[in-house]
Design a protein with these regions (language model features):
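Membrane-water interface of transmembrane alpha-helices
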Residues: 9-23
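Anionic N-terminal interaction surfaces
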Residues: 374-435
Length: 513
């Protein structure tokens, strides 16, 4: 029992130093950063106490209990204690100055504090997540770090980063010597694993389909407590590797917090696990910590947006090569129309590195950097170029089919699909006759020949691609979610909605003038 308790305590103490300190363990005389969270918020030298317990247990196992074992154990602990008091603490006081003296005044040496501030507690799950990131993710993806000197020495501050894949929080969070509270979308909390990991770090969800005042207050409260908060200003992961627009509401929230901003740029994260891919790929990632944006440079919202964009987005996306035997797996959900004939839902995966259009028969070879070529030409194009090409005339071909409802004057339907389920927070409708239609004026939910619900584009505040092949709209603070069939492509619906909404806003503006 003594050995197990001692081992657990010593390992936990070392992990805290490796994560939040400078990585120099107990007998170092050149400490540059001390740890004041977890066990170190309760006593200045937890490793000493756990070491004493451990070595006493070892002596008991090999010699059994007697008085000389007890005195030997106390003697070893006394030597270690004298080293801590006369050498290490003295050097730390001289090296770290007033900050360490304040720490000494607040944290005892001879006993443990049982009550500490909430922001000084470090959970087991938080340590587990960090350890997974360091031992597995950093090693597997060979993460390279740049600009670590830009990480602030003092809290609080806000981290903003481009968002390219599920692993983004690991790819930079493991290098920041503070516990980070991540602001995530509420959808991430739908899986048991992500809920376990995220709640363990104190992260919290923010709803995108309405103003989430509770989450906003939570974020502001954490900042006021001196914690580090990370928010992804795009509001979601990139689909094709190109950056998403920065949300104005997020910018205003960041500006309201009035703390320094640490921008982070991730290069290569999209390639190792694209949003459309069910499988991860082996590749290299570079994490770049950019210069801090001070509070005094945040007064103008447009200038703040420009600074954040400049730091977290690349001027030109260059796709890094990855290792994968099935690089095309899931790619039909990205390339939702043929580059040549523009037929929708026609791209099929034929092998791990090839695609084919079922309509015109064109075959495409996909390289390890996601570039595409045909047998008839050596010129390659990126998936981003492919998407831009099929978006160019996307509104020129409205649907020519019978719909289960009557179109309004000047209304043109562009997309229609049967759906598996429709739900809000209070309502669930699930049958085989549901259909979803997107026109240049509205989104319509129908059942056989009956129009069930209709939402004007003017009233829709947000359209999102969700998990498990679903899309959602936000209307009046209510989220309406539509589960699509497996063959339907969410990116296609997002693209059409964005373009139709843009046309609708432009026409509405012209009519007002």
């Amino acid at each position: 029992m003594f050995i197990l308790i001692g081992l657990y305590g010593m390992m936990s103490s070392d992990l805290l130093i490796l994560r939040f300190g400078d990585g120099k363990l107990h007998f170092s005389t050149k400490t540059t950063r001390f740890v004041d969270v977890g066990f170190y918020a309760r006593t200045r030298h937890p490793f000493f106490w756990f070491f004493s317990i451990y070595q006493y247990g070892i002596l008991l196992v090999f010699t059994g209990f007697n008085w000389w074992v007890l005195f030997l154990s106390l003697g070893i602990s006394l030597i270690y204690l004298l080293w801590l008091l006369l050498v290490q603490e003295s050097l730390a006081s001289r090296t770290l100055g007033p900050s360490y003296l304040r720490y000494k005044n607040n944290v005892p040496f001879w006993y443990w504090k049982f009550r500490v501030a909430e922001n000084l507690k470090i959970s087991f799950r938080s340590q587990l997540v960090w350890l997974i990131g360091m031992l597995i993710i950093r090693t597997w993806y060979g993460v390279k770090v740049e600009g670590a000197e830009n990480i602030p020495q003092n809290k609080p501050f806000i981290i903003v980063s481009n968002h390219e894949c599920y692993l983004d929080p690991f790819l930079f969070g493991i290098f920041v010597p503070y516990e980070i509270k991540f602001v995530t979308t509420a959808d991430v909390f739908t899986t048991h694993l992500m809920r376990f990991l995220l709640k363990g770090t104190g992260s919290f969800p923010m709803r995108r389909h309405r103003q989430d005042l509770k989450s906003i207050r939570t974020m502001i409260r954490m900042i006021n407590k001196g914690q580090v908060v990370c928010i992804f200003p795009e509001g979601g992961r990139s689909t094709d590797g190109s950056p998403l627009p920065i949300l104005k509401e997020t910018l205003k929230l960041i500006q309201h917090c009035k703390v320094p901003i640490l921008p982070v740029h991730l290069d290569g994260a999209y390639e190792i696990w694209p949003r459309w891919a069910p499988n991860r790929r082996r590749g290299k990632v570079t994490t770049s910590f950019k210069p801090l944006i001070p509070v005094e440079a945040q007064s103008d919202l447009k200038n703040l947006e420009h600074q954040i964009k400049t730091h977290i987005f690349a001027e030109e996306k260059i796709f890094r090569p990855v290792k994968s035997k099935a690089i095309t797996r899931g790619m039909e959900h990205l390339l939702w129309a043929c580059y040549k004939c523009h037929t929708r839902n026609s791209i099929e995966v034929t092998t791990g590195h090839s695609l084919k259009c079922s309509n015109c028969g064109t075959e495409w070879q996909v390289a390890n950097d996601y570039s595409l070529t045909t047998s008839s030409t050596s010129q390659s194009l990126s998936s981003t170029q492919w998407i831009k090409q099929i978006e160019a005339d996307v509104l020129d071909y409205p649907l020519n089919r019978e719909l289960p409802f009557t179109l309004e004057k000047d209304e043109k339907a562009h997309l229609h699909t049967p759906i598996v389920r429709y739900n809000t927070e209070e309502t669930v409708v699930e049958n085989g006759d549901l259909g979803l239609t997107l026109s240049n004026q509205r989104v319509v939910l129908s059942d056989k020949q009956t129009l069930l619900y209709s939402w004007s584009l003017a009233n829709i505040t947000i359209f999102t691609m969700d998990y498990f092949n679903a899309v959602s709209i936000g209307v009046g603070g209510v989220r309406h979610s539509f589960k699509l069939p497996p063959h339907e492509i969410t990116l296609k619906w997002q693209t059409y909605f964005d373009m139709l909404m843009g046309e609708y806003v432009k026409n509405d503006h012209n009519s007002v003038q």
